[in-house]
Amino acid sequence: MEYEALTGTLWDKGTFWVTVAVLIFLAFFGRKIVGAITTMLDQRSAAIQHELDEASRLRAEAEAMLKDAESRREAALAQAKDMLAMAGREAERLAADLLAEAEASARRREQMARERISAAEAAAIAEVRDAAAALAARAAEQILKETIDEAHDRGLIDQAIGGLPAALRQKAA
């Protein structure tokens, strides 16, 4: 039986016609598939770039806020010194309160900006990882398709045919 499966012409084998059908399919739709995948990856890249640009903008905004807070802090210090010259202890207490508030506000804003930047970076990294995982899965599928040969296919088919009577008996029972 195995000898019969290995003899004959190339035209008699099913794997030849499957290969021909796959090649014809790829000839007709290969560019469209590659184009669609390329478009999808370009869109994902643009989205990631947009998020990175947004993160950079937020970082610049945070730095501007920090500079603004520092300038307000310096102004508060100058005001506190003037009040210290006029009112002594009361001005000293007021300056400490303003300084603490400005520093806390600056820290909160800086922390919020850092969290936004970190979240945007994490999202971008996750999207890149997802794209890499999908690409690896497609590559593994292609490798598996290329490594399974005719002898392995015949063995699986013979095994399935051999198991049909037992499966039919179980189904009938």
From Swiss-Prot:
Sequence similarity: Belongs to the ATPase B chain family.
Superkingdom of the organism of origin: Bacteria
Record protein name field: ATP synthase subunit b 1
Record InterPro entries: ATP_synth_b/b'su_bac/chlpt, ATP_synthase_B_chain
MF-aspect GO terms: proton-transporting ATP synthase activity, rotational mechanism; proton-transporting ATPase activity, rotational mechanism
Ranges in coiled-coil conformation: none
Bilayer topology annotation: Single-pass membrane protein
Entry keyword GTP-binding: no
Role this protein plays: F(1)F(0) ATP synthase produces ATP from ADP in the presence of a proton or sodium gradient. F-type ATPases consist of two structural domains, F(1) containing the extramembraneous catalytic core and F(0) containing the membrane proton channel, linked together by a central stalk and a peripheral stalk. During catalysis, ATP synthesis in the catalytic domain of F(1) is coupled via a rotary mechanism of the central stalk subunits to proton translocation.
Localisation: Cell inner membrane
Taxonomic source organism: Acidiphilium cryptum (strain JF-5)
Alphabetic keyword roster: ATP synthesis, Cell inner membrane, Cell membrane, CF(0), Hydrogen ion transport, Ion transport, Membrane, Transmembrane, Transmembrane helix, Transport
Any Gene Ontology CC annotation: plasma membrane
Listed transmembrane segments: 15-37
Keyword field contains Cell cycle: no
Main location (coarse class): membrane
Quaternary structure annotation from Swiss-Prot or TrEMBL: F-type ATPases have 2 components, F(1) - the catalytic core - and F(0) - the membrane proton channel. F(1) has five subunits: alpha(3), beta(3), gamma(1), delta(1), epsilon(1). F(0) has three main subunits: a(1), b(2) and c(10-14). The alpha and beta chains form an alternating ring which encloses part of the gamma chain. F(1) is attached to F(0) by a central stalk formed by the gamma and epsilon chains, while a peripheral stalk is formed by the delta and b chains.
